[in-house]
UniProtKB/Swiss-Prot annotation:
It comes from the Eukaryota. Keywords: Cytoplasmic vesicle, Endoplasmic reticulum, Membrane, Transmembrane, Transmembrane helix. It comes from Ajellomyces capsulatus (strain NAm1 / WU24) (Darling's disease fungus). Required for the assembly of the V0 complex of the vacuolar ATPase (V-ATPase) in the endoplasmic reticulum. This is Vacuolar ATPase assembly integral membrane protein VMA21. The gene is VMA21. Its main location: endoplasmic reticulum.
Length: 108
């Protein structure tokens, strides 16, 4: 059963939609392409590294023992994650010295 909405409720719905549209637009502008490229490369590495490690070591290094090959695959995923964390920690936040000085000036 449908219920009637008052005019005030319609205005609230409109402001919510406008805020959602504005925040979605800001989110699209917020990510540099270098960050997206790094994320895609790490995602591909997280898929390919364990599969390649597992099937590459299953019959060569591990002699057919899937437990050891699986353990090496898990280690390879952890190596990829550690590399990503190091890259993310070293990455600049994108805030320049002028922006920092501007923020400090506004706080005073």
């Amino acid at each position: 059963m449908a219920s009637r909405r008052s005019a005030a409720a319609k205005k609230e719905d409109f402001s919510f939609e406008a805020a959602a549209t504005q925040s979605a637009h800001e989110a699209q502008e917020g990510f540099p392409s270098s960050v997206i490229i790094k994320l895609v490369l790490v995602t591909v590495a997280m898929i390919c590294a364990p599969l390649g490690t597992y099937f590459g070591t299953l019959n060569t290094i591990c002699g057919g023992d899937s437990s050891y090959a699986g353990a090496l695959a898990a280690i390879s995923v952890n190596v990829v994650l550690i590399i990503y964390l190091i890259i993310a920690a070293r990455e600049d936040t994108g805030e320049s010295e002028e922006e920092r000085k501007g923020k400090e000036g506004k706080e005073e």
